[in-house]
Amino acid sequence: MRHGIFILALLATAWLTACGQEPQLTAVPPGETVLAFGDSVTFGTGAAPGEDWPRALALKTGWEVINAGVPGDTAEAGKSRIQALLDQHQPALVIIEIGGNDFLRRRPRQAVKEDLRHLLRTVRQTGAQAVLVAVPELSLLNLVIGKGDASLYQELGEEEAVPVIDQVFSEILSQPELRADQIHPNAEGYRRMASGIYDHLKQAGAL
């Protein structure tokens, strides 16, 4: 049944993308499993246990949000672990927040983009829906001056017809009072991040 819903959603997102509209999601009811896949920002580095954004999102939605954040993880390395998580949890929706460590390691932009594309396609092949959380293109210089989202996330969202949660993480990092350090939110920052993700998901039809 989920595969049939996925096919309908895929057709709808392709049509909406062709029309220049934000790709839409099918509703994810309370109690469903959602996988938050990412790095230390998903894990919750910079805040106390239980103050991460996946936990805050679970409280707002009634979903069972699995925190699959691994500090230091990259889009490249994430390819080797996502399938096992999909098999184990069988999520209805996967929220992918990853790429910052790839940028810090100065990996080529196109390589990061293709690794993210691989993650998206792996998710969608299982019948789950996917969304991307845009990440700033971090570097030692940008840690000082701040920067908006890396453009490759919007490009990839358009190419793969998936919603992109933009101007959330980068906006939090631009406000010192919401940061634990230069690249991690604090507890309030994670609450704001969960609220921003919630608003985007609601607009896209997941709620």
What residue ranges belong to the model's regions?
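Bacterial N-terminal signal peptides that target proteins for export
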Residues: M1-L8
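Membrane-interface segments of envelope glycosyltransferases acting on lipid-linked substrates or membrane lipids
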Residues: H3, G31-L35, E188
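A general structural-boundary detector
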Residues: F6, G44, V65, G69, ...
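C-terminal motif of bacterial Sec signal peptides marking the signal peptidase cleavage site
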Residues: W15-A18
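Serine-esterase "nucleophile elbow" of acetyl-processing enzymes
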Residues: G20-A75, K79-Q90
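Alpha-helical cap/lid subdomain in secreted, periplasmic
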Residues: Q21-E22, L59-K60, S80-L207
